[in-house]
Each structure stands twice: as structure tokens, then as C-alpha cells.
Amino acid sequence: MGCFITFEGVEGCGKTTQIKLLAQHLTEQGHTVIVTREPGGCPIADQARAILLDADNRAMTPTTELLLYAAARAQHVQEIVKPALAANKVVLCDRFTDATIAYQGYGRGLDPATIAYLNDLATDGLKPRLTVLLDCPVEVGLKRAFDRINGAAGAREERFELESVLFHRKVRDGYLKLAEDEPERFIIIDGSQGVQETEAAITAAVLARLAEG
């Protein structure tokens, strides 16, 4: 069985950059690595992603949002994640179920029991072996996110960046509470530090977890 590692954090925390760096390092170490993301990761889930993140869809209700995430996740897990793990690969996933709890639970205020049920249904009980939480102040993350959006011609994936600072603070608080509740699964990394310092901290933690077998 492979190893399932997820990355979480507020907008602009640096997840995507760090996943690429870790994938390169693990590949050089001889691991077969799959890099994926949520929402998305496969054609059907990518179509849901386009709807979820399009800034033109601000009329979307929280419940619609939750159900679209669950549908995309169910397809992604069965089509991509589980087959890769069965093939003894390391799967690095940019967001997973914790994002739904943080964003739709803490951020939107949806019922935790409903979210837990849908997460369990969509994942068929699959849980990450390790979750890397890149934590940084909301203001720092949002500035990075908007710099990225403004630098990308025709960027449309900005619906969550347009939410209030208060919303993003609730999301961050949610992530930190999740990490507090499951310290054996989470590691918290300071996402406001430099890329190299962050990479070193993540690499050390991941290699230690892989060495556990």
C-alpha cells in the first residue's frame, strides 16, 4: 500500500509550490509519486472544479457548494487516489476532506455532522496518513493569492479569494482546530517563511513518516 499525504491551508499559503518541490525530492529518492488536487484531479472532477471556483458563480448556495465538492471527491478518490495507493505510489494531494470541514464547516457554518457523513461517503473511509498544514496569516495569504491571480491572464479561479477577510479567518481557525484535534496526523508548518525554509521542514517531516513504513 502506498502513502497518502495531503496539503491544507488558507488561500495563498504556498501549498502548490511546496507540493511540486516535495514531489521532485521524493522522485529523486526513488518513490513513484502522483500529484493531484481537489477539487479536480480527473476529468469529471475538473468539470466540478470549474463550476466551484468560477468567480461568476457567486450566487452558489453553501449546500450546492458542499454537494459539488463531495461529488468531485467521490470520483477523484475512486478514479485516481485509491488505484495509485494500491500500486504502492506516494499520493500528494492539494486539499482533501479537511478543506471541506474548514471552508464549508467553519467558514460557511454548515452542519458538521452532514459534512462528516458526506466526507465519509465520498472517500469510502479513506484518510491521509499525513496532513501538512501550511499556516500563515490570512492577510499574507490573500496578498499572495491576488498577486497570482493578477499575474495570470484570464484567471477565473478566484471565487474564494473574493470572500471576506472574516471568512478566511474562520477557515484558518478551523484548520488549526483540526490540527489540534489530530496531532498524530497533522504537522503545522509556518507558511509565511521563505520557500527553502518551508521546503526543508516539510521534507524532514514527510521522510520521517515514510520511514515508519
From Swiss-Prot:
Pfam families documented for this protein? Thymidylate_kin
Q: Locate the residues binding ATP.
A: 9-16
InterPro entries referenced in this protein's UniProt entry, alphabetically = P-loop_NTPase, Thymidylate_kin-like_dom, Thymidylate_kinase
- Record organism: Geotalea uraniireducens (strain Rf4)
Gene Ontology BP annotations: dTDP biosynthetic process; dTTP biosynthetic process; dUDP biosynthetic process
**Per UniProt, what is one GO molecular function of this protein?**
dTMP kinase activity
State the similarity comment.
Belongs to the thymidylate kinase family.
User: What lineage does the source organism belong to?
Assistant: Bacteria, Pseudomonadati, Thermodesulfobacteriota, Desulfuromonadia, Geobacterales
Q: What is its EC number?
A: 2.7.4.9
What's the protein called, per UniProt?
Thymidylate kinase
Q: Name one GO cellular component term.
A: cytosol
